[in-house]
C-alpha cells in the first residue's frame, strides 16, 4: 500500500498498519516502486516534498518524466469570492493547450458542496476541454491532464478543514495525528498527484491556508503565484 495516500481515517482506516506493518504481521520485506508514469517530475517533486514534511510518513525517492511547463503548480488568489476567477483559470488552460488537443480537466473540491462554486456555463464556454467536478476522495486512483483545486483556505470547510480536529473523531484516530493536519496533508497530496501536466490551486488571501503559505516558500521553486485579474480590476 501507499501510506502517502491513506485518506480514509473518517471510515476507521488506521495508518499504523502501514507504519508498523512488520510489528503487526511479522517479518516482511519492503519493495518501493520508484518510478511514476502518471505525472511529471516537477509535480512529483512538489508533492513528495510536501507529504514528507510529516516525519512519520515513509521516506521514498521516486523519479518521473520531465515537464514542458516552466512552472507546473500555479496558485491563483481570489480575494473577493467572485466566481469569475475560474474563467481566468480556464483561459490560462486554453492558452497552454498544445496543438488544440482536447484536455481532460478535473475540478477538485475537499467537499462535494463546492461544486456550486463552478459557473453554470463553464463547460459550454470551453468546449475543447473535457471538464468535470469530483471530490478529492472520489478522485483517488484517477488522473487528468489538468487539475484545479478549489478553496484551499482556512475555515471549517476550508483546506485543511478545522473539522479534522473534531474531538470525537480524534478518539479513533492513530497517534500519528500528533503531526498537525496529517490526514489533511495526505488528502492534499492525493489532489496534487491527480494531475498529469499542471495544477491550479485556488485560494483567498483573507482566509490563508497553511498549505498555501508553505507552498509559497522558497522550498517550492516549481510553484508560481498570481493574483486574479478579477481582483486587480476591483482594487
Over which residues does each language-model region extend?
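Inter-lobe coupling/hinge region of RecA-like P-loop helicase motors
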Residues: 27-35, 56-109
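Conserved nucleotide-binding/hydrolysis micro-motifs of P-loop NTPases
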Residues: 3-7, 12-15, 36-40, 80, ...
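Short, aromatic/basic amphipathic alpha-helical patches
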Residues: 21, 117-126, 210-219
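Conserved helicase/translocase motor-coupling segment
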Residues: 80-142, 151
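Conserved RecA-like helicase ATPase core segment
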Residues: 1-71, 161, 212
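Conserved helicase C-terminal RecA-like lobe
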Residues: 101-102, 127-130, 134, 139-205, ...
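C-terminal, charged and often intrinsically disordered regions of DNA end-processing helicases
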Residues: 107, 222-235
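Short glycine-/polar-rich loops that comprise or flank the Walker A/P-loop
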Residues: 2-4, 25-30, 69-72, 129-131, ...
